Amino acid sequence: MAFVMIREAKEGDCGNILRLIRELAEYEKLSDQVKISEEALRADGFGETPFYHCLVAEILSAPGEPQGPCVVGYGLYYFSYSTWKGRNIYLEDIYVKPEYRGQGIGSKIIKKVAEVALDKGCSQLRLAVLDWNKRAMDLYKALGAQDLTEAEGWHCFRFEGEAMRELAGK
Amino acid sequence: MRQPSVTSFRVRPAEAGDCPEILHLIKELAACENMLDAVKLTSKGKVTVGLAMYYFTYDPWIGKLLYLEDFYVIQAYRGLGIGAEMLKRLSQIAIRSQCNCMHFPVVTWNQASIDYTHRGALDLSSEEGWHLFRFNREELMDMAGEK
């Protein structure tokens, strides 16, 4: 089995990350919603004020193999804040290419994010899952997460585009 | 319930000195109780009657977002347009910071959630099926501890 390394993304990974972002959107059946560019990812993740952090899962090829290391998954997160508990981490995206699933790579990414969370004094890690994605829900529950939408009735609301401009203008 | 008379109000960014007041309002919001007794009204002084706590988040599909973590007006001061003014200021901040949307969590037994949809907000959990999950510190330590 090829060796997989979870490491912090570098600016040069943005092309690969965007490719995987599009794959994940496709998997979630929402690919027409991806509007971001590689340029924006670079500026927003690696500029003066990073708006996100990213880990990549990299397969290192065996000695003698012609191809170099290959990015096969990613975990994109940022720091948030709970007025009840303080510092939080929010795992916005986690994705592993289909042909590399079932090897524990997703779990390795989540565990690495958990380490970062503790290292930075965070008391919670939050994430969102689509209700039909039973495999992901089962994984998170097996790792000890609680479904707050089911347990406590939390829903995520959004004001976008026209609705937000109207609010601002009134 | 007698509504206090309000001649004017203003919405302003919080400063470090506001933290005790902010904590007070956070506890109120958590308890969802009518804490009118705790509000000290004076004829000349200023009273903090609401808060909006937000930060910037990131959606890899569209970029920066403004996330409204907490939004609260003391019950005795509702219906005066304070919440609407806070939402207006937040939207202006979002647009100025090049955010494409504002997200915020709502507990669906909260009647105010219906107000938000009337103002144009979308319930992503109902519309697209998103569920919010949480790992607490204990689970984080379990996960980080395993190698």
From Swiss-Prot, chain A:
EC supergroup of this enzyme: transferase
Q: Quote the Gene3D superfamilies the UniProt record gives.
A: 3.40.630.30
Q: Which residues form the N-acetyltransferase domain?
A: 4-166
Recorded protein name is Thialysine N-epsilon-acetyltransferase
Tell me the residue numbers annotated for binding substrate.
Answer: Y27, E28, E92, E152
**Assembly description:** Homodimer.
Task: Enumerate the active-site residues.
Answer: Y140 (proton donor)
As recorded in UniProt, coiled-coil segments are none
User: Which compartment or compartments is the protein found in?
Assistant: Cytoplasm
